[in-house]
Curated annotation (Swiss-Prot):
Family matches, as Pfam families: Acetyltransf_1
Residue intervals of the N-acetyltransferase domain: 26-189
Similarity-based family: Belongs to the acetyltransferase family. PAT/BAR subfamily.
Name this polypeptide is given: Phosphinothricin N-acetyltransferase
UniProt-annotated binding residues for acetyl-CoA: V110, Y111, I112, G118, Q119, G120, V121, G122, R123, N150
GO biological process per UniProt: response to antibiotic; response to herbicide
Protein task: Inactivates phosphinothricin (PPT) by transfer of an acetyl group from acetyl CoA. This enzyme is an effector of phosphinothricin tripeptide (PTT or bialaphos) resistance.
Catalytic reaction annotation: phosphinothricin + acetyl-CoA = N-acetylphosphinothricin + CoA + H(+)
Amino acid sequence: MPSSSSHPSTPDAPQRVGVELARCACTVRVVRDDDLPAITAIYAHHVRTGTASFEEVPPDDTEMRARCAKVLDAGLPYLVAERDGKLLGYAYATHYRPRSAYRFTLEDSVYIAPDAIGQGVGRTLLLTLIARCEGGPWRQLIANVGDSGNTASLGLHAACGFVQAGVLKSVGFKFGRWIDTVLMQRPLNAGDTTLPE
């Protein structure tokens, strides 16, 4: 698996990350430049058809490349799942907020290709992402789930050790209706039981 010294590394083998890793016949690896067209297409599908993302116009390939580079340049994990050369989904972490007191908190994003939903890809990606995040100094991982009716994402995060931390009512408006966001949270490493070094 390609890695860089600036990115936390963990083995490719399935790991225990608070819960048992789902069995998915796929390979999880670090993103490569040639993955971006498929990533752009997957995200565009979710922007156009769902409420997981509050974007309403899908970003183009140039914008998606810039976003990916920003994650990697920050030393944060950006992963893809593939099977037989086909990209099934992707997941990455970003800093939760830009102000310095948030420096030990990350936010996750997970998007799955429409024809790979329900195959354990999301769980495999998210658990691997959690393991990568635990390879760094971070202490909390936040999921900002678009739409309180998004049972797939809520269930995925709950299965991976997240708990609901709050609901922001009607903060989005898409497809002619108001949409909530659900904040979910999971500790990384020792969480808040110890002070960071």
